[in-house]
């Protein structure tokens, strides 16, 4: 994947996360979202955080959550965990739901 292709796909991930947080906040969720360059910080009511950031040199998107740190690469049309193969948005949904204590959905 070229650098340009990576940046286009990775920025689309950040935009989708932002849209999903907005949609969750339109419901019962209260998630504070802060963007600083290529880093998104999601802060939940209980003070816990999830950080999503881009890693251009490695062509990866990373998630840091209570559950741990996870690296995702674009493989076969989806961002996949480099260890487990889990899809990015499905995994982020699980981490956010766990930390928020309520269902939070993320999708592309």
From Swiss-Prot:
Disulfide bond positions: none
Lineage: superkingdom: Bacteria
GO biological process, one term: iron-sulfur cluster assembly
Annotated SMART domains: Frataxin_Cyay
Presence of the UniProt keyword RNA-binding in the record: no
UniProt keyword terms in alphabetical order: Iron, Metal-binding
InterPro entries, per database record: CyaY, Frataxin/CyaY, Frataxin/CyaY_sf, Frataxin_CS
GO MF, one annotated term: ferrous iron binding
GO cellular component, one term: cytosol
Task of the protein: Involved in iron-sulfur (Fe-S) cluster assembly. May act as a regulator of Fe-S biogenesis.
Family under the similarity heading: Belongs to the frataxin family.
NCBIfam families to which the protein is assigned, alphabetical: FeS_CyaY
Protein name as annotated: Iron-sulfur cluster assembly protein CyaY
Lineage summary: Bacteria, Pseudomonadati, Pseudomonadota, Betaproteobacteria, Burkholderiales
Gene that produces this protein: cyaY
């Amino acid at each position: 994947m070229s650098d340009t292709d990576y940046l286009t796909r990775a920025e689309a991930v950040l935009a989708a996360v932002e849209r999903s947080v907005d949609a969750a906040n339109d419901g019962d969720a209260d998630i504070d979202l802060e963007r600083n360059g290529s880093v998104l910080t999601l802060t939940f009511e209980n003070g816990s955080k999830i950080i999503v950031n881009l890693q251009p040199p490695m062509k990866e998107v990373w998630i840091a959550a209570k559950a741990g740190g996870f690296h995702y690469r674009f493989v076969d049309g989806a961002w996949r965990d480099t260890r487990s193969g889990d899809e990015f948005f499905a995994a982020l949904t699980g981490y956010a739901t766990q930390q928020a204590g309520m269902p939070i959905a993320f999708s592309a």
